[in-house]
Amino acid sequence: MTLTASSSSRAVTNSPVVVALDYHNRDAAMAFVDKIDPRDCRLKVGKEMFTLFGPQFVRELQQRGFDIFLDLKFHDIPNTAAHAVAAAADLGVWMVNVHASGGARMMTAAREALVPFGKDAPLLIAVTVLTSMEASDLADLGVTLSPADYAERLAALTQKCGLDGVVCSAQEAVRFKQVFGQEFKLVTPGIRPQGSDAGDQRRIMTPEQALAAGVDYMVIGRPVTQSVDPAQTLKAINASLQRSA
C-alpha cells in the first residue's frame, strides 16, 4: 500500500496524517500551526474551534498552505444538511463529513449538493460509530448489534448513497477494505504512536498498524499537538509509515 492520498488538486501532501486541532485559544492554535509544515499533514477543525473562531479561522489555515478536514458531522433534515455541505465546499475545505445515521435521503442530498463543484468538491465522508462508543453505549440506544456490525451496516448505506468513504475505527478497516473496495476511503481517529496515552478513544491503533489495516487517512491529535517538537514528531511518524508501506 502506498502513502499517496487520493484528493483534489489542492492537496499539497501525500501524507495520510490529519492532525486534530483541539485548542480553546486561537493564538495557541496558530502558534502550533506555525511550527509544522503543510507538506507533512492535513489539519482537522472540529465543532469547538469552528464555533469559537468561525470560517475565517479555516481560511487562515488554508492561507498557510494546509488542507482542511472540516469535522462538523452534519446530521439534519436532508435540505439543511445539503446546504451545510455546500457551504463547506464554498469554503474550499478538503474533506467534510455527515452522520451516516442521518439516513439515506440525507446522505444522498449532501452528495448531490457537491455535484456543481466538480473536481473541486471536498471528499464527503460519513461517520459510522464514534470511536468512544462500546457495545453497552449502543445498547443504551436500542442497538443490539456490536459496534463493528453496526459500523459495517452504516458503511454499506454510505457507499450505496455514493459518498467517498467513512470515518471508522482502525479495527474495522481490514474488513471494510475487503467488503467495500480500495476506492472507498477510510478515515480513522484514535490513532496514537506507540507509548501515547489512549485518552478518551476506546478503540485505538498505532499509525503503522492503521496503515497495514488499510486506513487511508489517520487522525492524530495530542501526540502531535502536545509534543515538545511537533514538526519532528510528524516527520518521525511519516518516516515510520514510509518504512511500513
UniProtKB/Swiss-Prot annotation:
InterPro entries associated with the record: Aldolase_TIM, OMPdecase, OMPdecase_AS, OMPdecase_bac, OMPdeCOase_dom, RibuloseP-bd_barrel
UniProt KW keywords: Decarboxylase, Lyase, Pyrimidine biosynthesis
Active site as annotated: 73
Transmembrane segments: none
Origin: domain of life: Bacteria
Reactions catalysed: orotidine 5'-phosphate + H(+) = UMP + CO2
GO cellular component terms, A-Z: cytosol
Annotated disulfide bonds: none
HAMAP family: OMPdecase_type1_B
Function: Catalyzes the decarboxylation of orotidine 5'-monophosphate (OMP) to uridine 5'-monophosphate (UMP).
The protein's name: Orotidine 5'-phosphate decarboxylase
Organismal lineage: Bacteria, Pseudomonadati, Pseudomonadota, Gammaproteobacteria, Enterobacterales
Gene transcribed to yield this protein: pyrF
